[in-house]
């Protein structure tokens, strides 16, 4: 339910309140791991002239670094507000939620002279469902059961290279 999820998000942000912005670098170094197959997925897509965007309900302090490391063409997420090198526990408006994810899908498709039906979108949460339904290929990746049951394409056990197989790539086409 959206209301309880929203309260959880507020609670999580409040837990960050007052922490040094340096905690982000520490978390990135010590706690963040990349999903298996992420690097191969992005390298293979890039070498074949594909465009990729990371659109997340998370925070830009993380997505910018993840996006740069993996080679996404652009990334969009929520901006944590800071004051005097400390996190305030607040997020810059507008919040990137389910409506904004759909808007980004259309904006990016339009920018590339594509229809949304020519785009693959991947998600795992309820806030991804509208975006997944508007994309030509909406993929539930290791999604919650309530999300997976609403998507025709589900990846429950494979790594991110499964997205390459969905597009017709064979393993010998992968760029490692």
What are these regions (language model features)?
Residues 1-11:
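Single conserved hydrophobic/aromatic residue that forms the stacking wall/gate
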Residues 17-176:
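C-terminal cap/substrate-recognition subdomain and adjoining C-terminal extension
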């Amino acid at each position: 339910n959206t209301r309880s999820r929203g309260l959880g998000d507020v609670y999580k942000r409040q837990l960050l309140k007052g922490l040094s912005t340096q905690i982000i670098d520490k978390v990135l170094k010590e706690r963040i791991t990349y999903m298996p197959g992420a690097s191969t997925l992005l390298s293979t897509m890039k070498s074949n002239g594909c465009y990729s965007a990371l659109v997340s309900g998370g925070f830009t302090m993380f997505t910018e670094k993840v996006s740069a490391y993996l080679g996404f063409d652009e990334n969009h997420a929520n901006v944590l507000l800071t004051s005097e090198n400390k996190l305030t526990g607040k997020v810059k408006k507008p919040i990137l939620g389910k409506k904004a994810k759909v808007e980004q899908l259309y904006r990016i498709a339009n920018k590339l002279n594509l229809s949304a039906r020519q785009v693959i979108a991947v998600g795992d949460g309820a806030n991804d469902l509208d975006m997944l339904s508007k994309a030509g290929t909406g993929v539930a990746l290791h999604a919650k059961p309530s999300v997976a049951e609403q998507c025709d394409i589900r990846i429950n056990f494979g790594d991110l290279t499964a997205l390459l197989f969905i597009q017709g790539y064979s393993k010998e086409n992968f760029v490692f």
